């Protein structure tokens, strides 16, 4: 990290590693591990950005009350956050409570494709045996928002005066275009925004869910009490943005006629992906999507401080270290961030996904996003820098990035160096 020039690093704490049963005593070995990691980062001038929940809930709580579908999780999560603030908050300034709760809820409670793999037929894309896709995604996000606001309130009351840190939440985004220029597709495109982004952001900014969601989901949509609405509203100090690619949207309002509906049917729109999410196919370099999402946060949600926490190119795991497509992707998207900044977006930082090749949630080791290749056959798991690592290092150090190796790029991305803009 030091050789690359990183001045910040984002990682998640495993709740079950720190507090194995979800509540009760802290695992001292887990505590030592995270203290060592944080101390090593700080000693090398690297600022830690810590996520408290990333698809990882203690199994004991899942078994006891169903995890995020129970209100009991709010108190347990708040106590877990309290332990993290207490133990690490003297060195950690940026806390993300939950990573991408919108797609976490869809994969985990609607389609059954990601942990905890809850769903109900006919909406499962796996062999689901438990859950209810018609309302559990809404319930899980509802409890996540309440847990987030509870942890944020605790931090502001108990820790902020001494630690001077910030608490936020991250949201998965994608650029969207109507499939056709018809009014139906244009309206459907806005409805997709409500269901994916507004689902999280509207409660945080306005204290309630989007009207389109409440209308289409009806009584299956949870409601906030007056007190809860006030607690959730304004409970974020920043927003983490997760962004990889863009989609097309077409109207699918016929689904509203079904008696049995899930999130996708309530959304009444079809999302057309340009790539298979479960493949190693590369993403097109189309940074307009990220730029438009950043503009929408500015226009619709009060221009909150934003950290782009994930943005990167997917390649096959056995591809060359000369990852030209990743260099072009990062160059293009960082340029899109620059355009958003020029338009007044409140972007505070950018994190490329990912520093190393890691086990990916959807496709394991079949694909890679890392700047560094990890040799899984080496007992020491030796790291090798890819071309993108060299390019990114030059960018971070404010050096010319218009030519790396034999690649010629249209603009010099050193003009958007973190040291110049992300203060």
What are these regions (language model features)?
Residues 2-6:
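N-terminal carbohydrate-binding accessory modules
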Residues 7-14, 47-51:
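Short, well-structured secondary-structure segments
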Residues 13-26:
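Glycine-rich, proline-tolerant flexible connector loops at the mouths of alpha/beta enzymes
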Residues 21-23, 31-423:
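Active-site region of glycoside hydrolase catalytic domains
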